[in-house]
Curated annotation (Swiss-Prot):
UniProt xrefs under SUPFAM superfamilies: Ribulose-phoshate binding barrel
E.C. numbers: 5.3.1.16, 5.3.1.24
Main EC class the enzyme belongs to: isomerase
Keyword Ligase in annotation: no
InterPro entries per the UniProt record, alphabetical: Aldolase_TIM, His_biosynth, HisA/PriA_Actinobacteria, Isoase_HisA-like, Isoase_HisA-like_bact, RibuloseP-bd_barrel
The keyword Cytoplasm is assigned to this record: yes
Protein name as catalogued: Phosphoribosyl isomerase A
Pfam families given in the database record: His_biosynth
Keywords associated with the record: Amino-acid biosynthesis, Aromatic amino acid biosynthesis, Cytoplasm, Histidine biosynthesis, Isomerase, Tryptophan biosynthesis
Gene3D superfamilies the UniProt entry points to: Aldolase class I
Organism: Streptomyces griseus subsp. griseus (strain JCM 4626 / CBS 651.72 / NBRC 13350 / KCC S-0626 / ISP 5235)
GO molecular function, one term: phosphoribosylanthranilate isomerase activity
Function description: Involved in both the histidine and tryptophan biosynthetic pathways.
Reaction equations catalysed: 1-(5-phospho-beta-D-ribosyl)-5-[(5-phospho-beta-D-ribosylamino)methylideneamino]imidazole-4-carboxamide = 5-[(5-phospho-1-deoxy-D-ribulos-1-ylimino)methylamino]-1-(5-phospho-beta-D-ribosyl)imidazole-4-carboxamide; N-(5-phospho-beta-D-ribosyl)anthranilate = 1-(2-carboxyphenylamino)-1-deoxy-D-ribulose 5-phosphate
Amino acid sequence: MPKLELLPAVDVRDGQAVRLVHGESGSETSYGSPLEAALAWQSAGAEWLHLVDLDAAFGTGDNRALIAEVAGAMDIKVELSGGIRDDASLAAALATGCRRVNLGTAALETPEWVAKVIAEHGDKIAVGLDVRGTTLRGRGWTRDGGDLYETLARLDSEGCARYVVTDIAKDGTLEGPNLGLLRDVCAATDRPVVASGGVSSLDDLRAISLLVPEGVEGAIVGKALYAKAFTLEEALKAVAA
């Protein structure tokens, strides 16, 4: 059976690596240089990096040059997210050499564009489904974006390759992942799912690992690593067991 992929996260705001609580602007804790953080995860054995431009996600500017520098310095696979919602931002993201990009808000506000991008770029495109209950939330999690399962059915029919599922109520809280939500999404699609939000312990990662046969492919880990709840080495060992 394939093992759960771990994607340590580097979220960038105003040029700094930060973590938010519930994805809310103003709740951030700063952790210094994004490049240093990314290189630390790489040297600890990560196979993926989840790199997010929070300013672009919130529409408060961007960190495009810095994001490109970090992505370019990596020998591992990079998943890029944040504010990718038109041809220009998508081209800039793909130009970094990242393995894939996550579309968020754009998928909710411009469905025709997303269908075109999925058709053109295939598995380089993942769609972020940011959920509160069964309602999707767009643009930096401040707007409603429709029903999760209706959107999932539409994206499936358009050939979307994978989904990154975040329970906003859990994100940045260290309260544990929403395993029920992950199960429900996996039951509704045959595409792989990457879990995001709430991972607080090695037991949480082991619990997500048990969902690999149901369709969970990976887990994004952020605050727990920065808060030193466990090391990345310990996490990689836990999901390999």
